[in-house]
C-alpha cells in the first residue's frame, strides 16, 4: 500500500532521517550477532574451498600426466578434508543453543532455533539509476536518497533485533521487495543485480539475478527470527511458555507459506522436503513448551491428573521420534545438522521416560479410596494401554496392590532404560556433550527414577518377569500454525516519488517529460481531465493552444507550475491550474511508449558444487549461433523454471516457483494494495 501524498510532500529526504525503519543491532553487540558474524566468515571460507575443489577437479579431468594427477588428487583430499572441517564448524554454530536461551533458564532442555541465512552486499545504485533514466525518463541523480535508504534497509535486515521490532524490520523489507519487483524488475530483462544467499545448514552460496530468491530468503529469516524469539522466552513462567508456543507456531506459519508457494528452490534449506522437517520440528518444540506449561506449577497427586501428564509426555516423545525418523531419511540426513537429529532423539527418549515415570507413580503410590470414582479410574486404566499386560485387567490393577506395584516397578525400569539411552545418545555427540544444562537435566531425571526404583526394590525382583506395555499417547494440544499478517503495519514505498505503482511500473514505459505552456481561451484550457493519480488528458480540442504546443490526448500530467502532481487527484490538479490566476501556465506531461526490451542471450549464475549437498542453480540458455534469421531465445521465467538438461547437469535444482492452483492463502500475507496482491508480485 502506498501513502496518498499531496503535492510538495515528496521532498526527497532520506527515510532514515524520518525514523522510517529501525536498524538492526551491530554485529558485535550480542552473543547471537557474534555467532552470525562467525557464520558469515565460515561461509566465505566454504566458498573459497569449493572454488579450489572445482579448479582441482577441472585440472584432474584436463590432464593425462600421471605425476600431475597424483599431485592434484593429494590436493583434492586436503580440500575435501578442509570442507568437512568447515561443515562441522558450521554445524557447531547451528547447535549453539545456549546463546539463544533465556539467561535464567537452567532447568529446561534447550530448544533448537534456526539460524539466519547470510547474504552478500548488493549494490542497487548503478542498475536502478540506469533503469530510472531509461524506463521512467527521470533524472536518476534525484533518487540518491531513496537508493541509500534501500541499501541501508537491506543491511539492517542482516542483523535484526531478536524481538517484534526485528520481525517488523524484515517484514518491511519483504514488502519493499514487492514494490521493487513491480518498479524495477521486468520479467523479460536482467538488470545485472546478483543476489547471493548462503544455505543455512551447509554454507553453500546460491547466486541469482532474480528478486524471488531475495523474497524467499527473507521469509526464511522471518521464520528463523521467530524461533529465536521463542527460545529466548522465559520458560519458568506461564506467560513465557505461552509466548514461546506462539512464536514457534508463527515460525511454522511462515515456513508453511514458503513451502506451499515455492515448488522448487535454489538452496536445499528452503526445499519442500527440508521445510517439511523443520515445520515438524518446530511444532514438536511448541508441543514441548505446552507440556512444560502443564506441569509448571507441579502435578497434583491425583489419579487422572497424573495419567493425563503421562499420556501428554508420551505424545511429546512420540512427535519427537517422528521428527527423528524424518531427519534420518535421505537426502535430509546428509544436510540437517547431525547434532540436531541427536538432540531430537534425546528428547524422544527423555519424554518417553517421563511418561513411564508418571505411570509408575500412579501404580505404586496412589491408593484407591472410597470417595474415588472407581468406574472412571478403571476406564482410564483401560485406555492407558493398547493391550493390557498378560493376566491382568483394569479392575485387577486398581484393586490388587501387589500387581500394581509389580507393574509400576516395570514402568520404572523402562523409564530408567530410556533415561540411560538419552544420556548415551547425548554423550555420543561431541557437541551435545558440551551443553552443560542438557547433561545436568538428563542426569537429574535419571537419578530421580533410580531413587524411586531403589525405594521399592527387593532381593527377589529378578524373578518378576512382568514387562510394562507401551503407553498410549494422548494430548489436548492442537498442533497448528499461525499465519502472521504482514500487512498490519503501513509501509511507505521507498520509490513513491516515481508515482503511483499502478501506473508507474515495469509494465509501462514512459517518454521523457515534455514542457507545455497552456493558455486559457474564454476561461477554458481546451481539454478535460480524468483519472486519479496521475490525471490524464482527454477530449482535447485540436484547435486549442495546448494542442498547438504539443499536448496530445492520452498524455498524463506530472507537474503543474513546477510542482509534482503524480499523486494528485483530478480536483487537486484543477485547483492547481486555477490557483495561479494567470492566463497561461506551464505543465509537464508524459506519454506511454511501446516496450522494446531485448532478451539477453545468457544469464549466468555462479556454481560451486559441494559433495553430498546440492549444486547451485544456473540460469542457462541454449547457445546458438548468431545468424540473421535467429530469433531471441525466450528465457524461462523464474516462476516456471523446471529441471532442464539432466544429462548435462543432473544435480541442478529448480528455481522457486509459485504453485499453480494451490489453496488460497489470502489471509496469510495479505496486502491492501492490489498491486502487491497480483500474481506477478507474489513470486
Swiss-Prot record:
Q: How does it associate, per the subunit comment?
A: Interacts with RhoA.
| Keywords assigned by UniProt, alphabetized | Coiled coil, Cytoplasm
Q: What is this protein called?
A: Rhophilin-2-A
Q: Which stretch is the leader sequence?
A: none
Q: What family does the database annotate?
A: Belongs to the RHPN family.
Its main subcellular localisation, reduced to a broad class, is: cytoplasm
Q: Name one GO biological process term.
A: negative regulation of stress fiber assembly
In terms of SMART domains, this protein maps to: BRO1 (SM01041), Hr1 (SM00742), PDZ (SM00228)
Q: What does this protein do?
A: Binds specifically to GTP-Rho.
Gene3D superfamilies in alphabetical order: 2.30.42.10, alix/aip1 like domains (1.25.40.280), HR1 repeat (1.10.287.160)
**What CDD domains does the record point to?**
BRO1_Rhophilin_2 (cd09249), PDZ_rhophilin-like (cd06712)
Query: Where in or outside the cell is it found?
Result: Cytoplasm, Perinuclear region
BRO1 domain segment(s): 110-501
Q: Where is the PDZ domain?
A: 515-592
Entry's Gene Ontology cellular component terms: perinuclear region of cytoplasm
Q: Does the keyword Phosphoprotein apply?
A: no
| Gene name as annotated | rhpn2-a
Per UniProt, residues of the REM-1 domain are: 25-99
Which residues are in coiled coils?
Answer: none
InterPro entries under this entry? BRO1_dom (IPR004328), BRO1_sf (IPR038499), HR1_rho-bd (IPR011072), HR1_rpt_sf (IPR036274), PDZ (IPR001478), PDZ_sf (IPR036034), RHPN1_2 (IPR047138), RHPN2_BRO1 (IPR047902)
Amino acid at each position: 500500500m502506498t501513502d496518498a501524498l499531496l503535492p510538495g510532500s515528496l521532498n526527497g529526504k532520506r527515510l532514515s532521517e524520518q525514523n522510517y525503519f529501525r536498524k538492526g543491532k551491530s554485529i558485535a553487540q550480542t552473543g547471537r550477532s557474534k555467532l552470525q558474524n562467525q557464520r558469515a566468515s565460515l561461509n566465505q571460507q566454504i566458498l573459497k574451498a569449493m572454488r579450489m575443489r572445482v579448479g582441482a577437479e577441472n585440472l584432474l579431468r584436463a590432464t593425462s600426466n600421471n605425476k600431475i594427477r597424483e599431485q592434484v588428487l593429494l590436493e583434492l583430499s586436503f580440500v575435501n578434508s578442509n570442507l568437512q572441517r568447515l561443515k562441522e564448524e558450521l554445524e557447531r554454530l547451528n547447535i549453539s543453543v545456549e546463546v539463544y536461551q533465556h539467561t535464567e533458564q537452567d532447568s529446561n532442555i534447550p530448544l533448537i532455533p534456526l539460524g539466519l541465512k547470510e547474504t552478500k552486499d548488493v549494490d542497487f545504485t548503478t542498475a536502478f539509476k540506469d533503469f530510472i533514466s531509461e524506463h521512467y525518463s527521470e533524472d536518476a541523480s534525484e533518487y540518491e536518497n531513496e537508493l541509500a535508504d534501500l541499501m541501508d534497509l537491506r543491511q539492517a535486515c542482516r542483523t535484526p533485533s531478536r524481538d517484534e521490532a526485528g520481525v517488523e524490520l524484515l517484514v518491511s523489507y519483504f514488502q519493499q521487495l514487492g514494490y521493487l519487483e513491480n518498479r524495477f524488475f521486468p520479467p523479460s530483462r536482467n538488470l545485472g543485480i546478483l543476489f547471493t544467499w548462503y544455505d543455512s545448514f551447509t554454507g553453500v552460496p546460491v547466486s541469482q539475478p532474480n528478486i524471488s530468491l531475495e523474497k524467499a530468503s527473507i521469509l526464511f529469516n522471518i521464520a528463523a527470527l521467530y524461533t529465536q524469539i521463542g527460545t529466548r522466552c522465559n520458560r519458568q513462567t506461564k506467560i513465557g511458555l505461552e509466548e514461546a508456543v506462539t512464536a514457534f507456531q508463527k515460525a511454522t506459519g511462515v515456513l508453511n507459506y514458503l513451502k506451499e508457494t515455492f515448488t522448487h528452490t535454489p538452496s536445499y534449506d528452503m526445499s519442500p522436503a527440508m521445510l517439511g522437517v523443520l515445520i515438524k520440528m518446530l511444532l514438536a518444540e511448541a508441543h514441548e513448551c505446552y507440556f512444560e506449561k502443564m506441569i509448571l506449577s507441579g502435578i497434583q497427586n491425583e489419579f487422572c491428573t497424573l495419567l493425563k501428564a503421562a499420556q501428554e509426555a508420551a505424545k511429546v516423545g512420540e512427535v519427537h521420534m517422528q521428527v527423528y525418523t524424518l531427519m534420518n531419511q535421505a537426502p535430509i540426513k546428509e544436510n540437517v545438522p547431525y547434532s540436531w537429529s541427536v538432540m531430537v532423539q534425546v528428547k524422544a527418549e527423555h519424554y518417553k521416560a517421563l511418561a513411564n515415570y508418571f505411570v509408575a507413580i500412579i501404580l505404586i503410590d496412589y491408593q484407591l479410596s472410597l470417595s474415588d470414582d472407581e468406574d472412571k479410574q478403571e476406564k482410564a486404566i483401560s485406555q492407558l494401554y493398547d493391550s493390557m499386560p498378560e493376566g491382568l485387567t483394569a479392575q485387577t490393577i486398581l484393586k490388587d496392590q501387589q500387581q500394581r506395584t509389580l507393574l509400576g516397578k516395570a514402568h520404572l525400569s523402562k523409564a530408567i532404560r530410556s533415561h540411560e539411552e538419552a544420556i548415551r545418545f547425548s554423550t555420543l555427540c561431541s557437541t551435545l556433550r558440551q551443553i552443560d544444562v542438557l547433561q545436568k537435566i538428563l542426569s537429574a531425571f535419571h537419578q530421580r527414577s533410580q531413587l524411586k526404583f531403589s525405594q521399592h526394590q527387593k532381593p527377589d525382583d529378578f524373578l518378576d518377569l512382568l514387562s510394562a506395555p507401551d503407553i498410549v499417547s494422548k494430548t489436548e494440544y492442537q498442533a497448528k500454525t499461525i499465519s502472521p499478517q504482514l500487512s498490519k503495519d503501513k509501509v511507505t514505498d521507498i520509490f513513491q516519488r516515481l508515482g503511483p505503482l499502478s501506473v508507474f511500473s515495469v509494465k509501462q514505459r514512459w517518454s521523457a517529460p515534455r514542457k507545455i505552456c497552456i493558455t486559457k481561451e474564454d476561461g477554458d484550457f481546451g481539454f478535460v481531465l480524468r483519472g486519479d493519480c496521475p490525471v490524464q488528458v482527454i477530449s482535447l480540442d485540436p484547435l486549442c493552444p495546448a494542442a498547438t504546443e504539443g499536448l496530445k490526448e492520452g498524455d498524463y500530467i506530472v507537474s503543474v507550475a513546477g510542482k509534482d502532481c503524480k499523486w494528485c487527484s483530478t480536483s487537486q490538479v484543477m485547483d492547481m491550474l486555477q490557483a495561479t490566476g494567470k492566463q497561461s501556465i506551464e505543465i509537464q506531461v508524459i506519454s506511454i511508449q511501446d516496450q522494446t526490451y531485448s532478451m539477453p542471450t545468457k544469464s549466468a549464475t555462479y556454481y560451486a558444487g559441494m559433495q553430498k549437498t546440492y549444486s547451485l542453480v544456473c540460469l542457462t540458455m541454449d547457445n546458438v549461433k548468431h545468424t540473421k534469421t535467429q530469433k531471441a531465445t525466450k528465457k524461462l521465467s523464474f516462476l516456471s523454471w523446471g529441471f532442464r538438461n539432466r544429462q548435462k547437469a543432473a544435480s541442478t535444482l529448480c528455481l522457486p516457483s509459485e504453485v499453480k492452483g494451490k489453496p488460497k492463502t489470502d489471509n496469510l500475507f495479505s496486502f491492501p494494495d492490489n498491486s502487491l496482491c497480483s500474481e506477478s508480485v507474489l513470486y
